[in-house]
Swiss-Prot record:
Residues 375-552 form the Helicase ATP-binding domain. GO terms for cellular component: mitochondrion. A motif (DEAH box) lies at residues 498-501. InterPro entries: DEAD/DEAH_box_helicase_dom (IPR011545), Helicase_ATP-bd (IPR014001), P-loop_NTPase (IPR027417), Sir1_ORC-binding (IPR021646), Y'_ATP-dependent_helicase (IPR050978). Keywords: ATP-binding, Nucleotide-binding. This is Uncharacterized helicase-like protein YBL111C. Present with 279 molecules/cell in log phase SD medium.
């Protein structure tokens, strides 16, 4: 808003503007809520001058004694003439109303005053001392909540970009009172700016169930509690949905379009609007804050210990059946497995996916690769293991089906890929996300925030797969999705594990893999295990080590594909089908791999000769050297530094050191 436009707006919404600004006090009472709704507020300190008795603003040069006698107000700053500044403070019935929290050892009261006033537009909320321990968390962890709000606005931007023709988020927002622009088009460059403003509101909504501010609005009724709507309406300033601040305007169009994010963000409006307008016709709530807090916690993925309870919706038959069940059965963790509704699929989906990824000239390398890709995408085989040589195209065996799944408009599939080492993550994510065919993100995002509704494939390492937080989220997937997105069309797709033989061969890491046995494999559409060096004995032992049945007794050749029987028992109840593409006399057409087996007297010397020859011909190339022991890794790295720029890593390094090496490889 231009300075001239702002001054016109100030005068139009404050009838006594001229006379009030001629007041000698720096602090001036203003009854216009519209002015405070439309112009950014700030918190300033004021004091009463002993000599003149006037209210003056505390400036940097004001003496220490004046600051000690000061008090704080939420104000709108206005300019009188060229160099004179006045501050307007909002008042209702009482002049110079002072409300808000009591002093705290954690926070100065102005911060909470500003947060509560801006979010709820309420002047009568009171906090007790216990609330300060909760409210202080925002300022102690502000960076964390800032990042959460950034991601919420990024989600808004993604939705708006996908629907530029009907989304008001890509147009200029206009204040419905003054008709002047408030926020221009939401852009990537402004997400962080607005995210900082959204963070306090998000914090309050996430923690509102821990605060005492709404406890006074509970009216006891026979057998249950209900919101005292009359008292709430007296305390809350009546606002229209269109008079909210810009963070709610951002999602206004999406709410009209019934978008999932907008539906969740609408809880911010419900807090400030009249709750339960018609009393008896509205649903009865345990607490006013419970619904709001629950919805936000679920959508933002902060419910690591959350388990949905459907006890309130169970019918009489369910209760009787539950009481009749044996105690032994009750102690077991029951897994609900069922036939999943299959979306229409065809072999043409794979061909279309290949052309998206590689261009119109795409062709499969051989018939084996074609048939196995169709097996993974089309067949009901719940668990598949593939052994193929390096360079054969194992990645495409699941990459193309994932792209085909992502093309299904009536269902959203979320898949997971796990690799053994951190150093493989960056390149893997780049490869799988090229050409924008898939939305790829780290598994750490899923663990920390939950499903964002946008990502098609999460990529992580074995440690992520074994973590308790990951297994808990998968176990509660269907309940969380149903509560968060209010649909069953967001499904778990593939669980893909690369180089799965490491579960058996890496003895020193086996203690880290124990948590994988707690994973609910039945929740996934299909499990895919890949390796270049996993003979049947190793593959069978590796699968059993993570809690699966193991390989089918009879090894399946690639030419013996057939559909499996009914899947009602779940993925973990069936043996894994093994497809071996490495045969003694087969000639697999590898596109870019040249393999040589050599017996030499000194392996390090021979390896050094090969590397020197390689970099002489191709100076920009890179090479990976695998050593048999950790000591040999460090020795080779030290001795070869005079020839090459070396980045080295082995399993005994800590996470921090691995991260440094990972960055070095990416660089």
């Amino acid at each position: 808003m231009k300075v001239s436009d702002r001054r016109k707006f100030e005068k139009a919404n404050f009838d006594e503007f001229e006379s009030a600004l001629n007041n000698k006090n720096d602090l001036v009472h203003c009854p216009s809520i519209t002015l405070f709704e439309s112009i950014p507020t700030e918190v300033r300190s004021f004091y009463e001058d002993e000599k003149s008795g006037l209210i003056k603003v505390v400036k940097f040069r004001t003496g220490a004694m004046d600051r000690k006698r000061s008090f704080e107000k939420i104000v709108v700053s206005v300019m009188v003439g060229k160099n004179v500044q006045k501050f307007l403070t909002f008042v209702e019935d009482e002049p110079d109303f002072q409300g808000g929290p009591i002093p705290s050892k954690y926070l100065i009261p102005k911060k909470i005053n500003l947060m509560v006033y801006t979010l709820f537009q309420v002047h009568t909320l009171k906090f007790n001392r216990k609330d300060y321990d909760t409210l202080s968390l925002f300022y102690l962890n502000r960076g964390y909540y800032n990042e959460l709000s950034f991601r919420v606005l990024e989600r808004c931007y993604e939705i708006a970009s996908a629907r530029p023709n009907d989304s008001s988020t890509m147009r200029t927002f206009t204040d419905f009172v003054s008709g002047t622009p408030i926020v221009r088009s939401l852009q990537k460059s402004t997400i962080r700016k607005y995210g900082y403003n959204l963070a306090p509101y998000m914090f309050l909504l996430l923690h509102v169930d821990e605060l005492s501010i709404f406890s006074a609005y509970q009216a006891s009724l026979p057998g249950e509690k209900k919101v005292d709507t009359e008292r709430l309406k007296r305390d809350l300033c009546p606002r229209k949905p269109t008079e909210i601040k810009y963070f709610s305007q951002i999602c206004n169009d999406m709410m009209n379009k019934k978008d999932r994010l907008g539906d969740v963000l609408a809880t911010a409006q419900r807090i400030r609007r009249r709750y339960n307008k018609n009393g008896s016709s509205e649903p009865r709530l345990k607490t006013l804050d419970g619904l709001t807090s629950e919805r936000w916690i679920q959508w933002l993925g902060l419910e690591s210990d959350y388990h949905c309870s459907f006890s309130s919706t169970r019918n009489a038959e369910d209760v009787v059946a539950g009481e009749a069940a044996s105690s032994d059965h009750d102690q077991k963790i029951s897994r609900v497995t069922r036939k999943r509704p299959r979306e229409p699929k065809s072999t043409n989906d794979i061909l279309v996916a290949g052309r998206k990824l590689f261009g119109s000239s795409f062709e499969f390398r051989d018939l084996h690769q074609l048939r196995l890709c169709h097996e993974i995408y089309m067949a009901d085989t719940p668990s598949v293991a593939v052994q193929a040589p390096p360079g054969y195209g194992k990645t495409e065996l699941f990459h193309l089906p994932l792209i085909a799944l992502a093309s299904k408009g009536d269902v959203k599939y979320v898949s997971f890929l796990f690799v053994p080492y951190t150093v493989l993550l960056a390149n893997c994510m780049i490869r799988l996300g090229r050409r924008g065919c898939l939305n790829v993100a780290p598994v750490r995002n899923f663990i920390e925030e939950g499903c964002d509704g946008v990502t098609d494939l999460y990529v992580g390492i074995y440690d992520d797969l074994a973590s308790t937080n990951f297994t808990d989220r998968i176990a509660a997937w269907e309940n969380i999705v149903e509560c968060t997105f209010r649909t069953n069309n967001v499904k778990l797709g593939y669980l893909i594990v690369d180089e799965f033989h490491n579960f058996e061969t890496e003895v020193y890491r086996q203690s880290q893999f124990g948590g994988i046995t707690n994973l609910d494999f039945d929740a996934f559409e299909k499990a895919i295990f890949l390796s270049g060096t996993a003979p049947e004995a190793v593959a069978d032992a590796a699968l059993q080590r993570i809690g699966l049945t193991g390989l089918a007794k009879k090894s399946m050749d690639i030419n013996e594909l057939k559909r499996s029987e009914d899947l009602s028992r779940g993925l973990s109840s069936y043996p894994t089908r093994m497809f071996n593409l490495i045969k003694e006399k087969s000639e697999v057409p590898l596109g870019h791999v040249h393999k040589i087996w050599k017996k030499v007297e000194s392996q390090p010397e021979e390896a050094l000769k090969l590397l020197l020859a390689l970099f002489e011909i191709e100076p920009e190339s890179k090479a990976i050297v695998v050593a048999s022991t950790t000591n040999e890794v460090e020795e080779l790295a030290c001795s070869w530094r005079k020839y090459f720029r070396v980045v080295w890593i082995h399993g005994k390094l800590g996470c921090c050191r691995k991260g440094v090496s990972h960055k070095g490889v990416c660089h």
